[in-house]
Design a protein with these regions (language model features):
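Von Willebrand factor type A / integrin I
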Residues: 99-157
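Active-site proximal loops enriched in glycine and acidic residues that flank catalytic Cys/His/Asp
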Residues: 24-27, 82-84, 91, 112-115, ...
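A short, conserved beta-to-alpha structural element at the edge of catalytic cores
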Residues: 13-35, 104-123
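Exposed acidic/Ser/Thr-rich ligand/metal-binding surfaces
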Residues: 63-107, 137, 148-156
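An amphipathic, basic-hydrophobic helix/alpha-beta surface used to engage anionic
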Residues: 1-19
Length: 157
């Protein structure tokens, strides 16, 4: 349910945010901008889930893929918006790369579908990522997402 919600959010942003680049992953990062830009939502979602879904989440590998394939896209004008729970299934969260990402970007906004009480429990690395985030918040509904993004972006100009 959270995946569909997040993909619908990214789909809605296409065409409304200049220079938007959208990526998704479970264990390997994929550029999902082309299907979101060119296909009806259900078709885009099915294709993205086929290409990306099904694996255990590995944030460390996603940061490595971002570094290897798309790092030049991130600079002092970039807002990085991470929509995810930060659960990396006991894999290396690659705080080194996430820290570099945060240093390169203008800001990093992370919105988790899990409430704050679950952050850092079990396989969650969210509290480890927290120091690198300009804003870390909870967003499980469309209203939460809208409020959290408005707060994060207005607070940091």
């Amino acid at each position: 349910a959270h995946v569909r919600f997040l993909l619908l959010f990214l789909y809605a942003l296409q065409g409304t945010v200049a220079d938007l680049r959208a990526f998704a992953f479970s264990n390997r990062l994929r550029d999902v901008g082309p299907p979101l830009e060119t296909l009806p939502f259900d078709d885009a979602m099915n294709l993205i889930l086929k290409e990306v879904g099904g694996g255990s989440t590995d944030y460390g590998q996603a940061w490595q893929d971002l570094y290897d394939q798309h790092w030049p896209l991130i600079d002092g004008r970039t807002t990085v918006l991470v929509l995810g729970d930060g659960r990396s299934n006991m894999t290396n969260p690659r705080l080194d790369l996430f820290g570099e990402l945060a240093a390169r970007a203008k800001r990093v906004v992370w919105l988790s579908p899990e409430g704050e009480g679950r952050w850092g429990t079990g396989d969650s690395a969210l509290l480890q990522y927290r120091p690198f985030c300009t804003h870390l918040g909870h967003a499980a509904t469309a209203a939460d997402l809208e409020r959290a993004i408005d707060e994060a972006l207005s607070a940091y100009g």
